[in-house]
Amino acid sequence: RDSSSALMAEALDAGAEPVFYGIAPDDEQAIAELVHRAVQECDFVITSGGASAGDYDYVTALVRREGEVLFDRISMRPGKAITFGLLGGKPYLGLSGNPAAAYVGFEMLARPAIRKMRGFAEGARPVQRAVLTHGVKKRQDRRFFDRATVSRDPETGELLVTEAKTQNSALLGTMQRAVSYT
């Protein structure tokens, strides 16, 4: 899965000057070398993949060992596996390697941070009120960012939001069609 290409475009859109260091092999030393290089050359380091607890998820351990992890999980879905901390005195954000989770993590955390660092008054994308076209069960355990499409009621002009039927974060088709989160 390639989360990086889409995130590079989003970082550029947010006002950053993204630098791509390639896709690292599942090798702790190779990953450490790329992250160290990014810390030397960049003001804010964002990685995708390696932020969870799998056999090849080395990045959080690296930040914990050489910097300071401020948090390594967040109560949202998709995107629970996120690491944020300081590495070499610079902010570090480790996003999930899952494309949908990486995108949501970027939108909710990286975009506002980049825009603030660049001096923009508004950090996040604009929020608009809309009417859901169907009922949604409220969930208390975490914040859900369900992909949705938006339309306009031809009679009233109201914005209408329809959640995608499938929210599996591995399915990219719903991401391609989504223009909103509920």
Regions found by a protein language model. Give the residues of each.
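Glycine-rich beta-strand-to-loop/alpha-helix junction loops that act as flexible
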Residues: 45-62, 69, 96
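Flexible glycine/proline-rich
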Residues: 64-182
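Hydrophobic alpha-helical scaffolding
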Residues: 1, 21-24, 49, 74, ...
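Active-site phosphate/pyrophosphate-handling residues
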Residues: 6, 57, 82
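Generic, well-ordered alpha-helical scaffold segments in large soluble proteins
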Residues: 34, 38-41, 62, 112-116
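Phosphate-binding glycine-rich loops and their immediate beta-loop-alpha structural context
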Residues: 1-47
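Loop/helix-junction capping segments adjacent to catalytic residues or to phosphate/diphosphate-binding pockets
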Residues: 28-29, 53, 103
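Short acidic, glycine/serine/threonine-rich loops at helix termini
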Residues: 31-33, 57-60, 86
